Amino acid sequence: MVLLVSNVFIIDRFFPQDALYPKNRAFVEQLSSIDAAVPSFTLLEICGVAGFRLSTKELESWLFRFTNVYPVLVLDAFGLKGQDAEEWWSNFVGEVAGGITRKMTLGDAVLLREAENYGPEAIITWNTKDFSRRTQVPVMTPSAFMQRN
């Protein structure tokens, strides 16, 4: 499994003039053959950004039926099931704070927390610098992932 960062979906839906769009689109077209996932927190981040440009109906589709929009798995927050909420929250905040102290945005720190717990094959993003030297999980662009696979 690979974890996808929000920029893959934002570029695909809203930035067809972006220089990365053709490569990004080629990657998105391959998603059905890739074991790809999006953490639930990343989905909320995506929808927070997209909400300014989507109709209410389309935004609801993204929020509650994202797997109908893109062929990816939406992951539950790691460790939430079977744990006391207070204990989970304390662990979650500590792990996310660890990312923030490594000079990461909140969204990237949350995704990194999920990645380091789920143990994916790679984190896929166009902004590899956001994760480089901050994790042992391999980080690559969609193009690099497609070339490798």
What are these regions (language model features)?
Residues 55-85:
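Helix-adjacent hinge/juxtasegments
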Residues 1-38, 51-64, 133:
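Short, well-structured N-terminal submotif of metal-dependent ribonuclease cores
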Residues 44, 79-87, 144-149:
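A short acidic, often aromatic-flanked loop/helix-cap motif at beta-alpha or helix-coil junctions
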Residues 35, 71-73, 138:
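Conserved beta-strand segments of alpha/beta enzyme cores
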Residues 112-149:
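Acidic, PIN/NYN-like endoribonuclease modules and their adjacent C-terminal/linker elements
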Residues 8, 41-44, 129:
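Alpha-helix/helix-capping structural signal
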Residues 74-126:
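Active-site neighborhoods of divalent-metal-dependent phosphate/nucleic-acid chemistry enzymes
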